[in-house]
C-alpha cells in the first residue's frame, strides 16, 4: 500500500477570461499515494467548500485517459510528470513528501481561460468541423471490409487516430501551434482510401481554420511530441505539410 504524503498545492485561480489571475497556496496533509490527481482535487475542493471558500474549477469527464478533458499543466508539464498519460492517470505516488505542486490551465491563445483551471477548447472542435471528416459516399458498413488496406498503413492510421484532442500539443509549444493535432486528424483519414477523395480540401481547410483561431506556426521543436499523452509522432506533421503543398500545387 502506498504511503501518505503531504505537499503544498499551488493552484491558479482566475474568475474569468478578462479577470486578473493569481496563485493560491493550499497545504495538503496526509494524502494517500494511490489517490489519483483528480481525486486529490476533489478532496481539496470538499475541504474548501466546508470552509466556505470557492472550490477549484477544473475540467474532467471520463477519468480513463480517453476524453482529453482533464487538461492541466502540472509542474511545468502538460498532464504532469508521466510520459504517455493524461492528468487523470497521474497518481499522488509520483510526487514526494514536502513537494510543491504547481497546477495551471493550458497557456495558449487558442484556449482562453473560462475559470481557474478550465479553458475553452472549442477551437479544436471548429478545426474538426472545417474538414476532419469524410463526407463522400463510401458505401455501406460491410463495404469497408471489402477494400484491401495494407496492415502497416492501417496501423499508421490507427496510431494517428489515437489523438484525443486534449490540447497538450498547443499548450507545450512555444508558438502555441496546433499542428500535431491537425496533422493527426488529417493523417488518420489521408492514409485510408475513404479519406483520399477529400484530402486536398481537408488539409487546406483545417490549416486555414487553425490559423484563423490564433494558433501559431510549427518550428519543429518537438515539445508537442514529447508531451503528448498518446505519443503521437511528428511524422504526421511532415505528412500534413506534403498534403498541403500537394493541394496548393493543384489550385
Model-derived regions, located:
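Short polar catalytic/cofactor-binding loops
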Residues: 11-17
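Short strand-turn-strand beta-turns centered on an Asx-Gly dipeptide
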Residues: 12, 29, 74-76
Amino acid at each position: 500500500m502506498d504511503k501518505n504524503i503531504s505537499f503544498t498545492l499551488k493552484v491558479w485561480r482566475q474568475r474569468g477570461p478578462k479577470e486578473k489571475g493569481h496563485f493560491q497556496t493550499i497545504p495538503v496533509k496526509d494524502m494517500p499515494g494511490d489517490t489519483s490527481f483528480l481525486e486529490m482535487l476533489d478532496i481539496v475542493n470538499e475541504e474548501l467548500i466546508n470552509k466556505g471558500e470557492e472550490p477549484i474549477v477544473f475540467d474532467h469527464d471520463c477519468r480513463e485517459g480517453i476524453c482529453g478533458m482533464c487538461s492541466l499543466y502540472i509542474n511545468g508539464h502538460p498532464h504532469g510528470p508521466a510520459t504517455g498519460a493524461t492528468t487523470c492517470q497521474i497518481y499522488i505516488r509520483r510526487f514526494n513528501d514536502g513537494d510543491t505542486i504547481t497546477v495551471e490551465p493550458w497557456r495558449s491563445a487558442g484556449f482562453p481561460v473560462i475559470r481557474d483551471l478550465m479553458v475553452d477548447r472549442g477551437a479544436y472542435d471548429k478545426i474538426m468541423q472545417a474538414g476532419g471528416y469524410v463526407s463522400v459516399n463510401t458505401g455501406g458498413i460491410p463495404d469497408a471490409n471489402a477494400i484491401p488496406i495494407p496492415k502497416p498503413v492501417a496501423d499508421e492510421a490507427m496510431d494517428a487516430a489515437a489523438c484525443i484532442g486534449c490540447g497538450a500539443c498547443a499548450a507545450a509549444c512555444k508558438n502555441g501551434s496546433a499542428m500535431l493535432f491537425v496533422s493527426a486528424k488529417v493523417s488518420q483519414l489521408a492514409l485510408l482510401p475513404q479519406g483520399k477523395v477529400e484530402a486536398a480540401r481537408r488539409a487546406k481547410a483545417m490549416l486555414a481554420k487553425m490559423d484563423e483561431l490564433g494558433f501559431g506556426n510549427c518550428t519543429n521543436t518537438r515539445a508537442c511530441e514529447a508531451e503528448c499523452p498518446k505519443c503521437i509522432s511528428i511524422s504526421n506533421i511532415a505528412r500534413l505539410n506534403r498534403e498541403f503543398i500537394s493541394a496548393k500545387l493543384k489550385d
